[in-house]
Curated annotation (Swiss-Prot):
Keywords (A to Z) from UniProt: Chloroplast, Membrane, Plastid, Repeat, Transit peptide, Transmembrane, Transmembrane helix, Transport
UniProt main location, coarse: plastid
Taxonomy of the source species: Eukaryota, Viridiplantae, Streptophyta, Embryophyta, Tracheophyta
Record PANTHER family: SOLUTE CARRIER FAMILY 25
Keyword Plastid included in the entry's annotation: yes
SUPFAM superfamilies: Mitochondrial carrier
Stated name of the protein: Probable envelope ADP,ATP carrier protein, chloroplastic
Binding site for ADP: 159, 302
Any one of the GO BP annotations: transmembrane transport
Solcar repeat placement: 85-177, 185-268, 279-359
Function: Transports adenine nucleotides.
Record gene name: EAAC
Pfam family for this entry, one: Mito_carr
Annotated TM spans: 78-98, 154-179, 191-211, 237-257, 281-301, 334-360
Length: 381
């Protein structure tokens, strides 16, 4: 007997006249008609009639799933996507979009990192001679060749697969968490969801970010495992978390502003423009640009705190040291290549993610239509 099945037991009552509880059943045709009309799909049961009482028992069963046939799925291939768990589809979309975007923009990221960490790598006095954008491009080509522009990209891709996937999936989850009593998401709720998503993804993948930085800016070619073992042996496990504080502080407002502006601008567009890829792309560029301009100084601080031999132990100390040495402009070193990298990077991620969400919604509608058609056909028989 199934564990979730209802059980009805009868107990004899000695003092009760048995003639009062003799049961009778309706005619077979009547019972069959009852089953067809009342117990057709969602339930099963039986009933009895007697002089003492009339007992009717109906056991609820699972609703029948009018699953699509193979032929129906072949005729409506988009419906196959709806069979994949939604969270898994969003996770995969975020991972692939992030990896593609990072690989395309890897040369700009390498240039930015060299510009940001120039002073720490060469010593505080040498930092006065800031390396420029063109100079960084020339330096990489001269010393390392074309492949030097992608140095450190492998750990970056390995990191960005879970990072991007977790971030985008977490954002959707946090948005549901921060909805108000009216089931609406306020601006504050969107900002909070973005901040929490950014910190969650950063915390989970931070050691790979530090490893990627060391591979990108330290001289010579070494493998990921060689750099990781060197860090562990010379600096300890804590070296994988250098700069975590400013990273969390920096990523929280960046993702909050970026995602919030993207959502709000898309929401304000007329209905006919919301579903266009061009609208998503332009909105993503705008949101990424504002977020980058606002939060870039914290990125410079965290990068300098991640370096071996850094003199900075806290965020205020790093801010003061950079401003004292280079002025306010020092906080924006590498901003140009970062902007050139971040705008397409973030735009590709958000646009791809937005398109995949719409694709998932369309596939769910197709699958529902197939199920409804199957149900109507079954009931008509």
């Amino acid at each position: 007997m199934e564990e979730d099945r209802a059980i009805l037991t009868f107990h004899r009552i000695p003092s009760l006249n048995s003639s009062l509880i003799t049961t009778s059943s309706p005619a077979k045709s009547g019972a069959e008609q009852f089953r067809r009309r009342v117990l057709r799909n969602p339930a099963r049961g039986d009933f009895g009639l007697g002089r003492f009482a009339c007992i009717s028992l109906v056991e609820k069963c699972e609703q029948r799933e009018f699953a699509p046939t193979t032929a129906q799925l072949l005729n409506n291939p988009l419906a196959i996507l709806a069979l994949v768990p939604k969270d898994a589809a969003i996770f995969a979309a975020g991972a692939l979009a992030g990896a593609a975007a990072k690989t395309v923009t890897a040369p700009l990221d390498r240039i930015k990192l060299l510009m940001q960490t120039h002073g720490i790598r060469l010593g505080q006095q040498s930092a006065k001679k800031a390396i420029g954008f063109i100079e960084a491009i020339t330096l990489i080509a001269k010393e390392e060749g074309v492949k030097g522009y992608w140095k450190g990209n492998l750990p970056q891709v390995i990191r960005v697969l879970p990072y991007s996937a977790v971030q985008l999936l977490a954002y959707e989850s946090y948005k549901n968490l921060f909805k108000g009593k009216d089931d609406q998401l306020s601006v504050i709720g969107r900002l909070a969801a973005g901040a929490c998503a950014g910190m969650t993804s950063t915390l989970l993948t931070y050691p790979l970010d530090v490893l990627r930085l060391r591979l990108a800016v330290e001289p010579g070619y070494r493998t990921m495992s060689q750099v990781a073992l060197s860090m562990l042996r010379d600096e300890g496990i804590a070296s994988f978390y250098y700069g975590l504080g400013p990273s969390l502080v920096g990523i929280a407002p960046y993702i909050a502003v970026n995602f919030c502006i993207f959502d709000l601008v898309k929401k304000s567009l007329p209905e006919e423009y919301r579903k266009k890829a061009q609208s998503s792309l332009l909105t993503a560029v705008l949101s990424a640009g504002i977020a980058t301009l606002t939060c870039y100084p914290l990125d410079t601080v965290r990068r300098q705190m991640q370096m071996r031999g850094t003199p900075y132990k806290s965020i205020p100390e790093a801010f003061a040291g950079i401003i004292d040495r280079d002025g306010l402009i020092g906080l924006y070193r590498g901003f140009l290549p970062n902007a050139l990298k971040t705008l397409p990077n973030s735009s590709i991620r958000l646009t791809t993610f937005d398109m995949v969400k719409r694709l998932i919604a369309t596939s769910e509608k197709q699958l529902q239509k197939i199920s409804d058609d199957n149900r109507n056909r079954d009931q008509a028989q």
